[in-house]
């Protein structure tokens, strides 16, 4: 077995519950400090560790810590029940109670509110003093407090990172269970016919996997659901789990001020399901785009706004930007922003191929002389966003910070489908200005980089004008993961 680092809990990569905590794991967590042998005051009982009463007593600090750690790791915390029982246990005998905050907690306001309803409460909070001396939180910034993603060669973000780190090329011939390529493939297009000159894409391993029962959806309805919506529901739920949020009553965010912004580019399943399954009572909510974000809100019992978006390859960027604007305007307090692409119908391949944007030879050859178009790809991802000051106050796990976001359109391009370097240059400058950053502060740029001759040239030209020249010793690396995982269209600018 590989030796475990001293500062890493065994098998635990974040706060989580498990029904199986071994004695060896508990020994590791509790440790071997001599303080564990110290005796507690006789008769001391700690309410809330072993259940709803305080009938269990502990003789030493070690016994108490082991019991507390076991419950923390293996039992779900029902805070509403715990606080209600605590309040009842205090009864009318305690007119005044003192509360000591041992660390940052998003539940402090709820606990204090319940206790203050029936008695006087004094709060000892050293954190307020220490935090007031720290750095001020940057106004206008958005925190990413949770995220998820899966795509070609990856079932989660760790596997996704491994695809990038190991330089994998995920393109393959279109699987037979997606579509019959031979029915539409040709070496040269004919006028009026739906044909395609490409045979490749980058695909998820299990596009049909979906636990319908977990989401309270019948098998009949699940079959009619757009796979894009199924995967977004799973991705968003996973992102919320990583952020520590659920549909429970102890949230630090008002469910009426939680929004969903979801982007998709095509309606492949509408064609597939209508042809194979006809119309059903569940067809409407199965394929109508509005039900993509709506299902998540319904699942989580949120009553904030939901938005179904389509701005082609900029879909996920639009979702994130609009979510940021809603947060900064304080229209909402938390937002889920994401997008999904699942390739399941040949017709979207045919008209993209006829438009001349798809590679006939394989994956995206970003910034290469032999670039001949992009390779389509599956992907599903979601971000959980909050105002930075709220994320700090709620002790959220801040994964990254969005200093600024912006969107525009290439209205002066040579055609509606081509890029405009001038528009991109203007947008880059706007983002830097709003973020109060100098171009030399930027240390890496993830490019759009689809592998088209016109698009790649325009993008690199805009980046060069804004971020060059650079001082000696401060180079600017650029990259594009589309060379690994293809172009996932609506999702592409968030992965």
Name each model feature, range by range.
Residues 1-156, 446-453, 486-487:
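Acyl-group transfer acyltransferase/transacylase scaffold of fatty acid/polyketide systems
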Residues 135-495:
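Condensing-enzyme catalytic core of the thiolase-fold
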């Amino acid at each position: 077995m590989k030796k475990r680092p001293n500062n890493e809990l065994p098998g635990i990569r974040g706060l989580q519950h498990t029904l199986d905590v071994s004695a060896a794991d508990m020994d590791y967590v509790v440790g071997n400090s001599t303080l564990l042998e110290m005796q507690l005051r006789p008769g001391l009982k700690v309410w809330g560790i072993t259940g709803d009463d305080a009938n269990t007593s502990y003789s030493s600090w070690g016994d108490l810590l082991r019991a507390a750690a076991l419950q923390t790791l293996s039992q779900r915390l029902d805070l509403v029940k715990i606080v209600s029982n605590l309040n009842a246990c205090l009864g009318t005998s305690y007119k005044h109670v003192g509360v000591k905050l041992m660390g940052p907690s998003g539940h402090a306001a709820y606990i204090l509110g319940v206790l203050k309803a029936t008695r006087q409460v004094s709060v000892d909070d050293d954190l307020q003093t220490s935090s007031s001396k720290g750095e001020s939180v940057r106004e206008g910034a958005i925190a990413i407090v949770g995220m998820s993603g899966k795509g070609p060669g990856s079932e989660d973000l760790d596997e996704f990172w491994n695809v990038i780190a190991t330089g994998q090329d995920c393109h393959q011939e279109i699987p037979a269970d997606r579509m019959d390529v031979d029915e539409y493939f040709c070496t040269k297009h004919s006028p009026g016919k739906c044909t395609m000159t490409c045979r490749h894409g980058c695909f998820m391993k299990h596009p049909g996997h979906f636990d319908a029962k977990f989401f309270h959806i019948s098998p009949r309805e699940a079959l009619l659901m757009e796979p894009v919506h199924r995967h977004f529901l799973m991705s968003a739920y996973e992102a919320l789990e990583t952020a520590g949020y659920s549909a429970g009553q102890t949230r630090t965010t008002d469910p009426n001020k939680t929004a969903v912004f979801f982007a998709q580019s095509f309606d492949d399943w509408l064609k597939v399901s209508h042809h194979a399954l006809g119309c059903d009572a569940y067809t409407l909510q199965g394929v109508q785009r509005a039900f993509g974000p709506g299902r998540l809100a319904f699942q989580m019992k949120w009553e904030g706004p939901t938005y179904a978006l389509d701005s082609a390859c900029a879909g996920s960027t639009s979702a994130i930007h609009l979510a940021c604007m809603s947060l900064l305007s304080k229209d909402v307090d938390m937002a889920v922003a994401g997008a999904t692409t699942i390739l399941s119908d040949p017709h979207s391949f045919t008209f993209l191929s006829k438009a001349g944007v798809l590679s006939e030879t394989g994956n995206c050859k970003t910034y290469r002389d032999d670039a001949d178009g992009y390779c389509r790809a599956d992907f599903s991802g979601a971000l959980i966003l909050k105002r930075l000051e709220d994320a700090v106050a709620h002790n959220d796990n801040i994964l990254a910070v969005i200093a600024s976001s912006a969107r525009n359109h290439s209205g002066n391009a040579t055609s509606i489908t081509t890029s405009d370097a001038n528009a991109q240059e203007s947008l880059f400058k706007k983002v830097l200005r709003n973020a109060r950053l100098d171009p030399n502060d930027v240390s890496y740029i993830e490019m759009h980089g689809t592998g088209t001759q016109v698009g790649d040239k325009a993008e690199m030209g805009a980046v060069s004008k804004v971020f060059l020249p650079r001082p000696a010793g401060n180079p600017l690396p650029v990259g594009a993961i589309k060379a690994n995982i293809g172009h996932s269209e609506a999702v592409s600018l968030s992965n």
